[in-house]
Amino acid sequence: IRDRASFLFDYGRGLHKQQQFSKSNRILKEALQRSCDPMILNVIGKNYQQMGDCLSAEDWFIRSTHRLPGRIYPYYLLAKLYAEPSFRQPDKFEKMKRMVLTKEPKVHSTAIRQMREEIKKIQLIFVHIKKDE
């Protein structure tokens, strides 16, 4: 069963990369029946975000934070979602930005550093938008 979950995740992620978001979600939701890997939740959320359903994306990313609260990645995904022009939520962005920048990672990595750098760049855009308002 575990191998099947891994296969379904890889297949669903491949469909995501091919921009087949609805089909990817169907496969990934099947994978959820066999695995509690939070990355499944993250990819489902990213699919919804790509389809323009930001509320569903938010729900799936939040579920991922609940599954493994120590992971920084879903907070990063939420911060980016809250920075989307069509879903802009500065207060929620600030909260997620703080999580990304201050949460102590289990392992320091290039990925963590890159996420933090990107969030800082997004923050600069928010500062400019606030000045223009």
Give residue ranges: language-model regions:
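Structural motif corresponding to the intra-repeat A-B loop/turn of tetratricopeptide repeats
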Residues: Q18, M51, P85-F87
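Single-residue signature of alpha-solenoid repeat helices
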Residues: S24, A57, K92-F93
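Terminal, low-structured helical/coil segments at or just beyond the last alpha-helical repeat
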Residues: D91-E133
